[in-house]
């Protein structure tokens, strides 16, 4: 991640929302450059580290929080759970998300794992930690990203417009206290990982339930369809 001002890296609405942690974003850029200088790579690639914040802040109606990026080289693209269109096979968690998507909404299974269309339609796909060392899960937890993403979540919740947070797993559920205030509802279930999907993720209908909560608050539903 190059040393640039926050408003050059993210969408204008997000630049304002993240202003309280601008110095922390700068510090994280310094951390990543130090990692590279020490011969340690990170994922996703530099231009994608803040990708979740390049979509309009004011248009977010759904928040889906992941833990940290996929540690498999070639998988992480800066949006939680999403992968590049050419990635095969899909990560198991994403395959389970797509199975629930098909069961919940009746749509065919998507042709690839690229969730960019969701992000373009108002779904914030945010990892709690925005980078990871390749093949080393959770390696950048506790390095400082949590302050940045906590600020982002609180800023979303503080708006007066409706939003639904989809919280998958225990780690995501701990964020519920940050969502207090504003007009934010939440949906909780086990994580879609193979270890927990059969314990309540399958059958939880997060996509249709989120749209019901949005329309009940006078907001437009999300078009969840993927190619």
Swiss-Prot record:
Predominant localisation class: cytoplasm
Localization: Cytoplasm
PROSITE patterns the UniProt entry points to: U_DNA_GLYCOSYLASE
Reactions catalysed: Hydrolyzes single-stranded DNA or mismatched double-stranded DNA and polynucleotides, releasing free uracil
GO molecular function, one term: uracil DNA N-glycosylase activity
GO biological process: base-excision repair, AP site formation via deaminated base removal
GO cellular component terms given for this protein: cytoplasm
SUPFAM superfamilies found in the cross-reference section: Uracil-DNA glycosylase-like (SSF52141)
E.C. designation(s): 3.2.2.27
Active site: 68
Key words of the record: Cytoplasm, DNA damage, DNA repair, Hydrolase
Superkingdom of origin organism: Bacteria
InterPro entries noted in UniProt: UDG_fam1, Ura-DNA_Glyclase_AS, Uracil-DNA_glycosylase-like, Uracil-DNA_glycosylase-like_sf
SMART domains (alphabetical): UDG, UreE_C
Function field: Excises uracil residues from the DNA which can arise as a result of misincorporation of dUMP residues by DNA polymerase or due to deamination of cytosine.
Family assignment from sequence similarity: Belongs to the uracil-DNA glycosylase (UDG) superfamily. UNG family.
HAMAP family reported in the protein's UniProt record: UDG
Protein name (record): Uracil-DNA glycosylase
């Amino acid at each position: 991640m190059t040393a640039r001002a926050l408003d050059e890296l993210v969408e204008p609405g997000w630049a304002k929302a993240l202003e309280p942690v601008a110095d922390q974003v700068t510090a994280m850029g310094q951390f990543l450059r130090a990692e590279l200088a020490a011969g340690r790579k990170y994922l996703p690639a530099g231009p994608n580290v803040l990708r979740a914040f390049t979509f309009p802040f004011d248009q977010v109606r759904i928040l889906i929080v992941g833990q940290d990026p996929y540690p498999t080289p070639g998988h992480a693209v800066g949006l939680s759970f999403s992968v590049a269109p050419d990635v095969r096979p899909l990560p198991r968690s994403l395959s389970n998300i797509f199975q629930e998507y098909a069961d919940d909404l009746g749509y065919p299974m998507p042709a690839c794992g690229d969730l960019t269309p969701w992000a373009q339609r108002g779904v914030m796909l945010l990892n709690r930690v925005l980078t990871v060392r390749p093949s080393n899960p959770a390696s950048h937890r506790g390095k400082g990203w949590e302050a940045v993403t906590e600020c982002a979540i609180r800023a979303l919740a503080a708006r007066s417009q409706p939003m639904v947070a989809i919280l998958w797993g225990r780690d995501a559920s701990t964020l519920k206290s940050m969502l207090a205030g504003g007009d934010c509802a939440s949906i909780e279930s086990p994580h879609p990982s193979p270890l927990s999907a059969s314990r309540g993720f399958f059958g939880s209908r997060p996509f249709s339930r989120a749209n019901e909560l949005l329309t009940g608050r006078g907001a437009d539903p999300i078009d969840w369809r993927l190619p």
